[in-house]
Design a protein with these regions (language model features):
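Charged/polar, solvent-exposed surface patches and flexible loops
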Residues: 52, 110, 145, 149
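Conserved G1/Walker A P-loop phosphate-binding module
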Residues: 1-68, 72-73, 79-88
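Switch II of P-loop NTPase G domains
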Residues: 64-119, 125-136, 144
């Protein structure tokens, strides 16, 4: 069991799975003496996603998003020069779960309450306009409308 838990929420395609993949890609090789390790099953999945993420262009370069009705759990151990610092679990709630409103909100609220940190992801496409008012509307519409009820 992990020492601590982090919860990630955001709409579909906001980049939660890409974030986990990129974090693991950077930290599994080591960075300033720090390394990140995980179990074999998770490592195999993340290594496959890393190869996908390293594709040069196009939509195919992104890892497959978490299934619309799934919550994916990743458990990691952070070490410094082979000495364990902390183990942590990262919960990746599929963006589609936030649209369903069935039992999801209570599950996500419970996860947030048990977490040390909450990561909120907003799709970069929401910022891809020169019109400031449009950007604000894009960010407020889907993410805020879906996330605000769970955060209250």
């Amino acid at each position: 069991m992990a020492d601590t838990k982090y919860t990630m929420i955001g709409m579909t395609s906001a980049g939660k799975t890409c974030y986990i993949t990129a974090m693991y890609m950077k930290m599994s090789a080591g960075f300033d003496g720090f390394t990140l390790v995980t179990d074999d099953r998770t490592r195999t999945k993340l290594e496959r996603d890393i190869l996908t993420l390293r594709e040069p262009k196009g939509q195919d370069r992104f890892p497959t998003a978490t299934d619309e009705t799934t919550t994916r759990s990743y458990e990691f151990r952070l070490s410094y020069e082979t000495k364990k610092i902390i183990t942590f679990e990262m919960l990746d709630y599929a963006g589609g779960l936030l649209r369903s409103r069935e039992n999801t909100y209570e599950q996500v609220k419970e996860s947030i309450a048990e977490s040390t940190a909450l990561y909120i992801f907003v799709d970069g496409k929401s910022f891809c306009t020169d019109d400031r008012e449009q950007r604000e509307e894009n960010v407020c519409y889907d993410p805020a409308m879906r996330l605000t009820p769970i955060l209250q």
